[in-house]
Amino acid sequence: MASSALWVIYFAFQQGIASLYGVTAEKALLAWNHSPATLSAVDDAHKAIQRAIEYSPEHPQYYFLQGRIFQWQAYLAQDQDTQQVLHAAKTAFLESAERRPTWPDTWAELLKIEAQLSAHDAAQLHSSKDSFDKFMRNADQYGPYTPAVNIAISQVGLAHWKQWDSEQKWLVIEHLARGLDGKNSRHLLADYLKSAHQFKLACTLASRREPKLEISICNSVLK
């Protein structure tokens, strides 16, 4: 009985310490949404999340946060290092997905990572076809109305439009419509599409969705 109680105390202590490190990493990621990260800040966040994983190696959220930190590192990295860091991010997200397969945001991030990897390596585009399909379908299955999923499928879907079959194209159209219509995604997605000079195309495709949605943000380009 005493040994069981000691184990419970030890486990709670481990989880508590892991949580402190995890919160430190998560706060850093939130701060970078407003003030871009620096390499030294990314390094500190890496150290924090690695400690969280050491104390709680089966916690899926810590691997998800690790993947996000690697994404920032890839953004800041020199060109020759980008591929290696993106692969590390993908590995972290896959670890998270293995432990929490129904979390849609993880599949959305994996979809974006796969697109980035193929953009840096044309030879990988063909080999990524199955991964694209798996990540997109899982994101859609587990989070069909999740803003992160709507945005990821819209962005990657348009960027790789020519490679999709008919069913996949209709899936992209569905998420374009949801993303441009959703109050928590419409402005972020529209800003991205405008910066990529794809806004009118996206609105035109979204208008094909049946039943139609009244996508007010597209009114200016669909008159």
Labelled PLM ranges:
Residues 1-15:
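Hydrophobic membrane-insertion alpha-helices, especially the h-region
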Residues 6-8, 42-50, 83-94, 126-140, ...:
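Alpha-helical repeat scaffolds
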Residues 25-37, 67, 72-81, 111-129, ...:
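Short coil/turn linking the two alpha-helices of tandem helical-hairpin repeats
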Residues 29-32, 36-91:
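Extracytoplasmic/periplasmic/luminal assembly and interaction segments
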Residues 50, 54-58, 101, 144, ...:
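Short coil turns that delineate tetratricopeptide repeat
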Residues 160-223:
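Terminal, low-structured helical/coil segments at or just beyond the last alpha-helical repeat
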